[in-house]
Amino acid sequence: MVEDILAPGLRVVFCGINPGLSSAGTGFPFAHPANRFWKVIYQAGFTDRQLKPQEAQHLLDYRCGVTKLVDRPTVQANEVSKQELHAGGRKLIEKIEDYQPQALAILGKRAYEQGFSQRGAQWGKQTLTIGSTQIWVLPNPSGLSRVSLEKLVEAYRELDQALVVRGR
């Protein structure tokens, strides 16, 4: 089981779709060697060094957290049903209401659209909020994603810079 890494006062909570088998096996988020999450958040400015999956708890030192929409591990995220994503979206709203980070970054358009019953999502900041928490949709850093490392870093950096401008 991959546990959430959450606390009050976070700048951002990154929300993956569900754990892959590597993460489920190790208990660490974004654990597959091909997953680019740790490299991306470092290069985008969220951390001052590239953390390893087993150092995930150190995200809190940078006022970052991690959660997921669905607990069930799968080989590929497309194995998660619309119903699971929708139910996960309701649970996620409760978590975010409890912790109220500055931003919630949903990693993937499908996750956002199906988890929050939205259509036609664009990358970046959304108009929908959860209380005072901004919602952002960012490309998924999975190794299965065709988005280049450069584009991932650019998208994540936009969020990091927006939070700096917001004074957080």
From Swiss-Prot:
Source domain of life: Bacteria
MF terms (GO), sorted A to Z: DNA binding; pyrimidine-specific mismatch base pair DNA N-glycosylase activity; uracil DNA N-glycosylase activity
Compartments where located: Cytoplasm
Keywords: Cytoplasm, DNA damage, DNA excision, DNA repair, DNA-binding, Hydrolase
EC number(s) from the headed UniProt entry: 3.2.2.28
GO CC, one annotated term: cytoplasm
InterPro entries, per database record: MUG/TDG, MUG_bact, Uracil-DNA_glycosylase-like, Uracil-DNA_glycosylase-like_sf
Catalytic activity: Specifically hydrolyzes mismatched double-stranded DNA and polynucleotides, releasing free uracil
SUPFAM superfamilies recorded: Uracil-DNA glycosylase-like
Signal sequence extent: none
One example of a Gene Ontology biological process annotation: base-excision repair, AP site formation
DNA repair found in the keyword field: yes
EC primary class: hydrolase
HAMAP family assigned to the protein according to its UniProt record, in alphabetical order: MUG
Family annotation (PANTHER family): G/T AND G/U MISMATCH-SPECIFIC DNA GLYCOSYLASE (PTHR12159), G_T MISMATCH-SPECIFIC THYMINE DNA GLYCOSYLASE (PTHR12159:SF9)
Summary of subunit composition and partner proteins: Binds DNA as a monomer.
Family (UniProt): Belongs to the uracil-DNA glycosylase (UDG) superfamily. TDG/mug family.
Job of this protein: Excises ethenocytosine and uracil, which can arise by alkylation or deamination of cytosine, respectively, from the corresponding mispairs with guanine in ds-DNA. It is capable of hydrolyzing the carbon-nitrogen bond between the sugar-phosphate backbone of the DNA and the mispaired base. The complementary strand guanine functions in substrate recognition. Required for DNA damage lesion repair in stationary-phase cells.
Protein name: G/U mismatch-specific DNA glycosylase
Provenance organism: Escherichia coli O139:H28 (strain E24377A / ETEC)
